[in-house]
Amino acid sequence: MLLKYIEIANFKTEMGKIVSIKLSYQTFGKTLHTAPIVLVNHALTGDSTVCGKEGWWQDLIGENKCIDTNQYAVLAFNIPGNGFGNDTRDLIENYKDFTARDIAKVFILGLKKLSITSLYAVIGGSVGGGIAWELAVLKPTLIAHLIPIATDWKSTDWLIANCYLQDLILNNSSNPIADARVHAMLCYRTPISFKTKFDRTTNKSLGVFNIESWLIHHGRKLKNRFHLATYKLMNQLLKTIDITRGRGSFDEVVSQIESHIHVIGVNSDLFFTVGENKDTYLKLKELHLKTTYYEVESIHGHDAFLIEYEQLTRFLTPIFKNQNQQAQSKSTRCASKKAV
């Protein structure tokens, strides 16, 4: 892991707070500016390690994978305050001063520092996808392909309600990270997913149902690697996704986006429902914007974007294969001209 850093001074949040931010990032594959750049936004418990042995999207990104690091320069920022690298000095305690849009603005500043003026694609799941939407609005000509997965351009009332409950747990529980994680797992999965996996079986050695043992495990696992301040911040970002806030109607805001927008929903998602995704897609079509809709079929709910890699690969391959073919074709033409 080689983390690189960008110092951003005097950043003004939507709430009017002035802060200094250390933005960390990793790159994979081709060197920046030598190949098409793909920006990958991580989700609530993720980080910039998107590929490789420890990569959370290693089944999608890597050598000869769907997003081929032999062909693309892959860039991933850490959301400031996510605790990656275990430097507690970079944690953000005043989490309510930040919104998803603030993070998108920080990413834009990071891209500027790296002299990046165009991105072949921005891809992200859940809150990372919400930040991707914000990026597309902030810089309408920046992104060729916008790929928000298991997310939407806004946090719904249902999502806000769950984030509110998460915030209550995080601020009032005696075991906040583990308890909040247990509740969150109920939103990330589905009843049929649990039935298929556990079917009311018991863990005799522990004297509990296997579903309870599984929830306890996930609570402890996150507690051992996550900071409380980080969880509070990420939950706040999830709650504040809204590209229309202070800008006008959805139609007015998205009409300026020049990206091809690939909406990818999950048919069983309880967090960002497929109905909301379809509505978004239909509105984009009505506005005659470049858009495509894909739907992951899964019993696993929201977490399907971290599970159903075969389906995601099938949806994404045409997007990334086309660029590879164009690049190869261009190289061939150049070689032919030189030969002549």
Regions found by a protein language model. Give the residues of each.
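Conserved hydrolase catalytic core segment
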Residues: S118-D157
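Alpha/beta-hydrolase-fold enzymes
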Residues: L142-K221
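Conserved acidic catalytic loop of the alpha/beta-hydrolase fold
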Residues: R101-Y120
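Conserved alpha/beta-hydrolase "acid-adjacent" motif
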Residues: L270-D279
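Catalytic-loop region of hydrolases
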Residues: M1-I37
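N-terminal cap/lid subdomain of alpha/beta-hydrolase-fold enzymes
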Residues: Q26-N86
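Short beta-strand/loop motif that positions the catalytic acidic residue
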Residues: I257, V263-G265
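Catalytic active-site module of serine/aspartate enzymes centered on a nucleophile-bearing elbow/loop
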Residues: D279-Y281, K285-V340
